[in-house]
């Protein structure tokens, strides 16, 4: 009989199975519960604390309490962010954006979905030392833009100048043929490293990976003098040890080179540094075509055409910098720099045939041979003292000696009979000293007060030999005092400044001394618009003094018909400049639009007049000169962290009103840059049409140039191949003069600059820990030789 309680063995087995099933259900439930428990969310919105505008692409990073990375994201187009799949625990959330202070939020014992609401970030000028930026970023201020290069841009660059080309900044051009940084519209570019003004060859010496950011001053303050653009490279500061670098670019199919070597040694508070640059050029395909039209005093009209033949050009440029600095952080900085510049140009020769256009059989042979040598040693002493209550004092003294020697032989001959023989020799010595003192005070709410004194005094002794022996002794002095205040009212940033200037000049044996006092105010208004856009209005007044070469009371024979003559009666004049700038950023797109007007009454401009059977070229204070400028810069990228391009274009309209002439000239120009990177490879292409300049009666043409470069990087070594003007064989620069008595249209060619292949190599290494000297706030230099040049 079967019992009603069941079989004990069977009952025991079922009990065991049920227990196992219960355990698995409990474990599975715990896993599901744990999985849901781990899937926590953190969300919020980021705004600008000042104007409550949303902040796109702000960085949001979640870290553990010991700073280990957990998750990260960026805000979207509406300023929102979301972090999901977060485990329970305690965290720190950091929210940052370029130009703002980082906000830290403590999230202790996070166990549920959390909404942080609105997070406000306050303004700050940040330094991203040690942080990799995945996309080039920029923050704009009234006087400057702070730009952080991306990792992609740094990997595609072999030096600091290459990096500038990759960043595609508005109004900044990198001239690959002449290896220099330029500002569109003949502007003055000043370059610095950690606040210290340096030469452009030292920018080429920078290792891109050491560059934290570039402070692009497109509205420089009064303490920057006459600079139109200031580029300040902020680099990492070494602690101890040293570094060495080499940067070389050598033409393959012609003699064109740019080579730079540099090194630094650091010990405790001291730094020793040196750099040397050499730039050889040796061309045999240089020529000049020129068409001139003369209307002489006797009623004769002569239309003469110069048909150029290939000639020789040779140039060697040497730059040496030796530097010592001693710094006590937050106390003082002493910096001493010795600079030596030497440009040796033994040949800059033209030859060809001069033909009478009315009678092509009427020809003469022509040679125009020039040579020059220039050297300028300079000693720069700098002292900066940091005081209490955010105050700084700066003292700077620079002494420079400029020595210039030049020769020119111009001859016209027919059937080996010499018709015209011009032999000019110039020997010039110039001594100058520049002294400056600056005071700065940081106030509350980001306001700043600064003031300074500056004095520049020069003495020039020149000898001109051209059948006669002329000697000139000239003295020129310029003193100024300035004050500037920068403040902020809600969304409006403003800057008010004024400079009082005294300029004087005297020339021995000439009754043409002058002394002039001027007051030059300056105003800047900067307003942040909704979104990432802004508008800026700038208005300046400045005093312009004549150069010593223009003031020299001597004659220089140019050819059989023309003489160049200095004018000791020239006076300084004022320049009035107003600029309106609009800037817009949205995701990958950046737009910068500019409109400007400049007015110079009594401007010093060229003129020509008849004197007997000769035509005199000289300078005088004319009625006025005006220009209207409009330009637009569009930059897109990086796209997929691979491609970036920019397009610039604009119009220049010049109004030149002389005492006896009136001219109008309009120039349209454009420029395009494309950069692509893939892994260790980089490709870059640029094309630029002529930005032409017109003043007085002369149009000076810009460059019409193209360039393409392929590069490969391996650690600190980068090699590349560059081609200048790969698709053209007629590179030229044009100049025109519209004078009623002696007009010309001239084209200068250098055959080697077309399809010029250049091999490049950049290498940097360091040893030990690093340390860098402090930031030097000013640097002065005298680059005016003080002599009058001659020639066509």
Label for each model-derived stretch:
Residues 50-64, 140:
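Short, ordered, surface-exposed loop/turn motifs in non-cytosolic proteins
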Residues 38, 61, 78-80, 101-103, ...:
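Membrane-proximal, glycine/serine-rich, low-complexity loop/turn segments characteristic
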Residues 65-80:
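Short, acidic Ser/Thr/Gly-rich low-complexity loop/linker segments typical of extracellular
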Residues 285-301, 347-363, 405-416, 461-469, ...:
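Outer-membrane beta-barrel translocator domains and adjoining extracellular loop/strand segments
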Residues 432-434, 565-567, 571, 577, ...:
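Outer membrane beta-barrel strand-and-loop segments of large Gram-negative receptors
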Residues 317-345, 368-510, 589-597, 626-651, ...:
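Face-selective signature of the C-terminal outer-membrane beta-barrel domain
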Residues 63-68, 90, 94-106:
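A short, solvent-exposed loop/turn motif at the edges and junctions
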């Amino acid at each position: 009989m079967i019992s009603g309680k069941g079989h004990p063995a069977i009952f025991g087995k079922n009990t065991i199975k049920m227990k196992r099933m219960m355990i698995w259900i409990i474990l599975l439930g715990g896993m599901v519960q744990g999985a849901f428990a781990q899937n926590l969310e953190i969300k919020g919105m980021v705004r600008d604390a000042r104007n409550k505008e949303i902040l796109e692409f702000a960085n949001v990073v979640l870290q553990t309490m010991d700073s280990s990375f957990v998750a990260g994201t960026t805000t979207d187009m509406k300023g929102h962010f979301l972090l999901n799949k977060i485990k329970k625990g305690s965290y720190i959330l950091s929210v940052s954006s370029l130009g703002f202070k980082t906000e830290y939020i403590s999230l202790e014992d996070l166990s549920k979905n959390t909404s942080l609401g609105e997070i406000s970030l306050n303004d700050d000028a940040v330094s991203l030392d040690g942080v990799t930026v995945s996309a080039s970023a920029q923050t704009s201020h009234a006087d400057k833009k702070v730009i952080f290069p991306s990792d992609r841009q740094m990997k595609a660059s072999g030096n600091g100048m290459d990096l500038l080309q990759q960043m595609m900044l508005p109004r900044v051009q990198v001239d690959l043929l002449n290896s220099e940084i330029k500002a569109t519209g003949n502007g003055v570019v000043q370059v610095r490293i950690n606040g210290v003004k340096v030469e452009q060859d030292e920018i080429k010496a920078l290792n891109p990976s050491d560059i934290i950011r570039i402070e692009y001053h497109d509205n420089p303050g009064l303490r920057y003098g006459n600079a139109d653009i200031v580029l300040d490279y902020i680099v990492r500061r070494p602690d101890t040890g040293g570094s060495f670098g080499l940067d070389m670019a050598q033409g393959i199919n012609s003699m064109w080179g740019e080579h730079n070597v540099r090194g630094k040694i650091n010990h405790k508070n001291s730094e020793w540094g040196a750099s040397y640059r050499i730039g050889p050029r040796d061309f045999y395909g240089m020529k000049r075509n020129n068409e001139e039209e003369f209307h002489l005093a006797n009623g004769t009209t002569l239309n003469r055409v110069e048909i150029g033949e290939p000639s020789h050009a040779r140039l060697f440029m040497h730059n040496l910098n030796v530097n010592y600095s001693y710094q006590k952080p937050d106390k003082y900085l002493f910096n001493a720099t010795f600079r030596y510049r030497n440009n040796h140009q033994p040949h800059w020769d033209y030859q060809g045939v001069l033909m009478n256009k009315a009678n092509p059989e009427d020809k003469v042979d022509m040679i125009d041979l020039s040579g020059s040598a220039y050297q300028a040693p300079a000693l720069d002493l700098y002292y900066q003292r940091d005081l209490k209550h955010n105050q700084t004092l700066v003292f700077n003294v620079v002494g420079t000696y400029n020595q210039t020697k030049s020769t020119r032989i111009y001859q016209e001959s027919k059937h080996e009979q010499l018709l015209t023989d011009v032999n000019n020799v110039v020997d010039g010595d110039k001594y100058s000293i520049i002294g400056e003192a600056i005071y700065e005070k940081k106030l509350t709410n980001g306001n700043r007060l600064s003031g300074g004194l500056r004095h520049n005094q020069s003495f020039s002794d020149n000898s001109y030999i051209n059948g006669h022996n002329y000697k000139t002794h000239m003295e020129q002095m310029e003193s100024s005092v300035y004050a500037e205040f920068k403040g902020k009212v809600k969304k409006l940033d403003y800057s008010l400044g004024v400079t009082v200037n005294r300029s004087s000049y005297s020339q021995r044996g000439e009754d043409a001394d002058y002394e002039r006092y001027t007051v030059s105010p300056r105003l800047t208004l900067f307003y942040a618009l909704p979104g990432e856009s802004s508008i800026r209005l700038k208005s300046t007044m400045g005093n312009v003094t004549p150069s010593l070469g223009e003031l020299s009371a001597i004659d220089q024979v140019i050819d059989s018909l023309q003489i160049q003559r200095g004018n000791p009666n020239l006076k300084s004049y004022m320049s009035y400049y107003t600029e309106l700038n609009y800037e817009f950023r949205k995701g990958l797109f950046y737009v910068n639009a500019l409109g400007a007007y400049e007015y110079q009454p009594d401007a010093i401009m060229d003129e020509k007049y008849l004197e007997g059977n000769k035509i005199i070229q000289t300078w005088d204070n004319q009625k006025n000169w005006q220009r209207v400028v409009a330009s637009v810069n569009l930059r897109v990228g990086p796209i997929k962290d691979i491609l970036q391009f920019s397009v610039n274009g604009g119009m220049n309209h010049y109004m030149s009103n002389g005492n006896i002439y009136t001219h109008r000239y309009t120039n349209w120009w454009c420029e395009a840059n494309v950069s692509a990177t893939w892994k260790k490879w980089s490709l870059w292409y640029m094309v630029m049409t002529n930005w032409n300049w017109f003043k007085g009666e002369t149009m000076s043409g810009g460059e019409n140039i193209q360039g393409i470069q392929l590069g490969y990087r391996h650690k600190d070594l980068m090699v590349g191949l560059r081609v200048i003007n790969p698709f053209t064989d007629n590179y030229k620069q044009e100049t025109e003069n519209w004078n009623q008595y002696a007009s010309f249209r001239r084209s200068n060619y250098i055959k080697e600059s077309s399809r010029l292949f250049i091999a490049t190599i950049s290498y940097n290494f360091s040893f030990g820990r690093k340390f860098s000297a402090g930031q030097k706030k000013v640097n002065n230099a005298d680059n005016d030789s003080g002599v009058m040049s001659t020639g066509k």
